[in-house]
């Protein structure tokens, strides 16, 4: 279901229904929900620092990648690459 959620984010971005900032926000929520389901750790409201203490480097790396596009005054990022990295991280876990 999380891979399908990423596919929808990708399609919505490609079709102009999501801008960069919102695409990254949705990716962040997707990976956080996935981690919660897999570990029972409620990471939905964790800061990047909190996530760093979990010992899950893939998740830390992804959320760190999302931070600038999510919160910067001007969002920049490679949504397609980030979607692929997120998809790959989820596939390695399942």
Feature map (PLM): residue ranges:
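Membrane-proximal, non-transmembrane interaction modules
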Residues: 11-94
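Charged alpha-helical initiation segments
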Residues: 1-14
């Amino acid at each position: 279901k999380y891979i399908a959620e990423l596919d929808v984010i990708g399609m919505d971005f490609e079709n102009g229904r999501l801008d960069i900032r919102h695409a990254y926000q949705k990716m962040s929520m997707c990976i956080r929900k996935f981690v919660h389901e897999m570990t029972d750790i409620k990471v939905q409201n964790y800061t990047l620092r909190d996530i760093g203490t979990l010992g899950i480097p893939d998740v830390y790396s992804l959320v760190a990648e999302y931070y600038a596009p999510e919160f910067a005054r001007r969002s920049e990022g490679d949504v397609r690459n980030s979607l692929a990295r997120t998809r790959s991280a989820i596939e390695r876990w399942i």
